[in-house]
UniProtKB/Swiss-Prot annotation:
GO terms for molecular function: oxidoreductase activity. Its EC number is 1.-.-.-. This is Pyridine nucleotide-disulfide oxidoreductase domain-containing protein 2. It is an enzyme of class 1 (oxidoreductase). Probable oxidoreductase that may play a role as regulator of mitochondrial function. The gene is Pyroxd2. GO terms for cellular component: mitochondrial matrix. FAD binds at residues 38-71. Keywords: FAD, Flavoprotein, Mitochondrion, Oxidoreductase. Belongs to the carotenoid/retinoid oxidoreductase family. It comes from the Eukaryota. One of its GO terms (biological process) is mitochondrion organization. Transmembrane segments: none annotated.
Length: 581
């Protein structure tokens, strides 16, 4: 679809140069032949790692292959006048101490917290005096109960207990996010000193156990059972269950009936922003503004960040130790350590010389589950969507539900399961699960006056299509048209409001952002690929078989979701190792 219509006659405008960009014109921006540490990839985790290392006095350089930093946490004006969070689009899971330590607000980070945060309209006939029903959830528990009681009074009474139950589990899991997993290798094969040091890695696990106490078996079930089972035990109304279940399958090639889907839900409710547990926000200026703030913090301390500098190979010396990188243009940069924010597959199967990696390790990396159900569609529109269940106010000003994650085709968990079954057969879902967000409802800087940016996070779309088909432009547009038809049923007039769109299928997400298989987490967040086993068993502490080479991206513990924890944790592991060299 060609760009056109109101607001699109504006030429691409240049925003003020971020602090980190200005820093590159200074002394610390010139490429040097040697650094203490080199970071491959300027995704948010790589930037966090660089910022922490630089704070600790480790001279660090970051090399990014694209023209823009942030990895998947990026803002791009791909349609003139419209700024899109092109891949990741919401913030919640970023560790609070990262915001504090790196002084991100000082470096320009501004958040728009959403309250209410979830809106699920029903696809049903209204009457003269009654609109189609909808489920609107926010931080006001009394208001939530009133909304839920439309569907079940019993569920309205049970909902506060469910929220408290999940909150306690989040508090227990929280300490596990901020440290490397238990060092089982040291316990098994380390020296006495190494074993004593490894005892400290048990503390987060012990703390989690104490927090859960006698309820540990119930919480174990939440982590291992299908989310449908967990929700069926507590609720009876499908709109509530399906709305909650979306957090258990988002970004995952799983159904609500898949064992272990409960953990993915937990992963998406464990965030905390500005002291509010479970809060989700839009970032002023898009997700790239978060990456700019982290980069600014790192650059202010002296880190060097380079764009359009692709790392072609990790250099390994004759003793099997990483000693720098070779760039695509042939330039060599030496360093004492190398951190990779790239996925495990790119890091170990493409960049690291294979002769230095054990065959069993390479095999495990190549077998990681990276299935992705996600197609992201970024849309420029010339008016707000007008939902039948919540008609727009006069003047077309954003209302509370417009700032929410708007869940479409999510009235019943059976709809989610059927959408999953379509994709398992190699077909895009006939009724895809759609999470529609309108960040410009809270941040008008993202679009021309009167216009809006719409983010459509949709699933399920398989990476490989049945019948030998490929994701060409025709297939992509056919699927996008299907998504738009679904939205039109809830919000008539949506299709007429569309000015332009950007369609990113799993192969596109892999090609542009190097997300393996298009997986937004760098690999499935299933129980067999978490904690001790992320990315693979025996190598969950950010180290790998090549000494001096570390993994610091979402493929490492604790996983994806614009959390920053992997970058922060890896930086501390690297710093300890540097002190012992």
């Amino acid at each position: 679809m060609a760009a056109g219509g109101r607001g699109l006659i504006r030429a691409l405008h240049s925003s003020p140069c971020p602090t980190w960009k200005r820093a590159q014109s200074g002394a610390n921006g010139r490429l040097k032949p040697e650094y203490d540490a080199v970071v491959i990839g300027a995704g948010h985790n790589g930037l966090v790692a660089a910022a922490y290392l630089q704070r600790l006095g480790v001279n660090t350089a970051v090399f990014e292959r694209r023209h823009v930093i942030g990895g998947a946490a990026v803002t791009e004006e791909i349609i003139p006048g419209f700024k899109f969070s092109r891949a990741s689009y919401l913030l919640s899971l970023l560790r609070p101490q990262i915001c504090t330590d790196l002084e991100l607000k000082k470096h320009g980070l501004k958040l728009h917290l959403r309250d209410p945060y979830s809106f699920t309209p029903m696809l049903e006939e209204g009457t003269l005096n009654r609109l189609p029903r909808s489920l609107l959830l926010g931080t006001d528990m009394a208001a939530n109960q009133k909304e839920i009681s439309q569907f079940s009074r019993k569920d309205a009474q049970a909902f506060p207990r469910y929220e408290e139950f999940m909150k306690r589990l989040v508090l227990a899991i929280d300490p596990l996010l901020d440290a490397a997993p238990v060092d089982t290798t040291a316990f098994q094969h380390g020296s006495l000193l190494q074993r004593l040091r490894a005892l400290s890695t048990l503390k987060p696990l012990l703390k989690a156990g104490r927090t859960l106490g006698a309820q540990l078996p119930q919480y174990y079930e939440v982590l291992t059972a299908p989310i449908s089972k967990v929700l069926d035990q507590r609720f009876e109304s499908e709109p509530l269950k399906a709305t909650l279940a979306t957090d258990a399958v988002i970004g995952a090639m799983t159904s609500p009936h898949t064992p272990g889907s409960g953990y993915v839900l937990l992963h998406h409710v464990m965030g905390s922003l500005e002291g509010t547990q479970g809060a989700w926000s839009y970032v002023q200026g898009g997700m790239g503004a978060l990456s700019d703030a982290i980069a600014s913090s790192a650059a202010t301390r002296g880190a060097s960040i380079f764009t359009e500098k692709t790392v072609a190979k990790v250099q390994v010396n004759s003793e099997g130790r990483a000693q720098g990188v070779t760039l695509q243009d042939g330039e060599e940069v030496r360093s004492r350590v190398v951190l990779s924010c790239a996925s495990p597959q790119v890091t170990f199967l493409e960049l690291t010389p294979q002769e230095w990696l054990p065959g069993a390790f390479v095999k495990r990396i190549s077998q990681l589950d990276t299935q992705s159900p996600v197609t992201k569609i970024n849309v420029a529109v010339d008016r707000l969507p007008n939902f039948q269940a919540a008609p727009n106010a006069p003047g077309d000003q954003p209302q509370g539900h417009h700032q929410c994650s708007i869940h479409l085709n999510c009235e019943d968990t059976l709809l989610l399961h059927q959408a999953f079954e379509d994709a398992k057969g190699g077909l895009p879902s006939q009724k895809p699960m759609i999470e529609l967000c309108i960040p410009s409802s809270l941040d008008p800087t993202l679009a021309p006056p009167g216009c809006h940016v719409v983010s459509l996070f949709t699933q399920y779309t398989p990476y490989t299509l049945a019948g030998g088909k490929v994701w060409n432009e025709q297939e992509k547009n056919t699927y996008a048209d299907k998504v738009f038809d679904c939205i039109e049923a809830y919000a008539p007039g949506f299709k007429r409001s569309v000015l332009a769109r950007d369609i990113l299928t799993p192969p596109d997400l892999e090609r542009i952002f190097r997300l393996p298989g298009g997986n937004i987490f760098h690999g499935a967040m299933s129980l067999d690929q978490l904690y001790f086993a992320r990315p693979v068993p025996q190598h969950s502490d950010y180290r790998c078989p090549v000494q001096g080479l570390y993994l610091c991206g979402s493929g490492a513990h604790p996983g994806g979701g614009v959390m920053g924890a992997a970058g922060r944790n890896a930086a501390h592991v690297v710093f300890r190792d540097l002190k012992n060299m």
